[in-house]
Amino acid sequence: MKIKKRIIPNLKVIDDVVYTTKQFMPHRVTGETYSVFDYFYHTQADEVVICDISEKKNFSKFLSKVKRITKKYSFPLSIGCSIDTLDKAKQIMNAGSDKIILSSGIFKKNYKLISKISKIFGSQSIQVSIDYKRLNGCEYISCSNNNFIQKNITEHMKFCIENGAGEIILNSVN
């Protein structure tokens, strides 16, 4: 069986700068947001993921950036930006995003949010991002920035899917 290759860059953004990251710490500037988008647009990326990793989130500023990006570029877009309310999810989707990314840490605060969003936009529009690490034979998932709790990753993925996630993004931080 031949599997179709897809190019899906995952861009970590703070303001108008794209970074590569390692273990939650920005460590290398990749470039200015729009020049990086131009590059992936011309190299025919199949989809682009944008995650706002700034510590002080400015949702309205980020939302404006998403609107500019969706007007200029025509590839599918997944957006992650600390979406913690139904209203924020609606705004991101109405700005032109094809999918939204929810951090699995959101379940600690409001585990019903994913099912509410899924009922409106469909599970195909919901990605849940799980940051995890393995230490001494145990599995841990992130519940916020650098705070991890011990939890079985497979069970957590099942929980996310049962509550409306259409896709799971696993990020190893080991």
Predicted region positions:
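Conserved anion-binding
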Residues: 2-3, 13-26, 93-174
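N-terminal beta-alpha supersecondary unit
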Residues: 18-60
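Short, acidic/polar
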Residues: 28-41, 85-91, 148-159
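A structural motif
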Residues: 45-46, 74, 97, 165
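Glycine-rich, proline-tolerant flexible connector loops at the mouths of alpha/beta enzymes
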Residues: 46-65, 102-105, 169-174
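Alpha-helix-loop-beta-strand connector modules within alpha/beta enzyme cores
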Residues: 58-80, 114-132
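Catalytic cores of alpha/beta
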Residues: 64, 72-100
